């Protein structure tokens, strides 16, 4: 069972982001991600994805989340995993394999508010994100 957190949802600041990081996904990323044990045909079978209303198979949510995490780790932690305490966010749109995910970050001390977008389609794919970084 999944329960939503009682914490207030972080809001994206109304100013330009402090940092931006673009990371491209591989066209075959959804097929590779099946190694995690998620065999949902939504991520691998075009006909199944079309019946679900998508133009093609979509990337796993965990993969989208991990790309945003990679951007945070690279940009805010200098790839020092010991500085990366936690992250959370809300999925808001699918990502298609091969798309570039842009993570925009607003830094306030140890707290980083972020969102991830796919600029080519003009959509936000992960919104109201919050990460805690150890200074």
Where is each model-derived feature located?
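Short, small-residue-biased leader/transition segments that mark boundaries at the very start
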Residues: 1-2
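N-terminal leader/targeting segments
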Residues: 5-16
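Hot-dog-fold acyl-thioester-processing enzymes
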Residues: 14-75, 79
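Hydrophobic beta-strand-centered segment that forms part of the acyl-chain substrate-binding groove
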Residues: 64-111
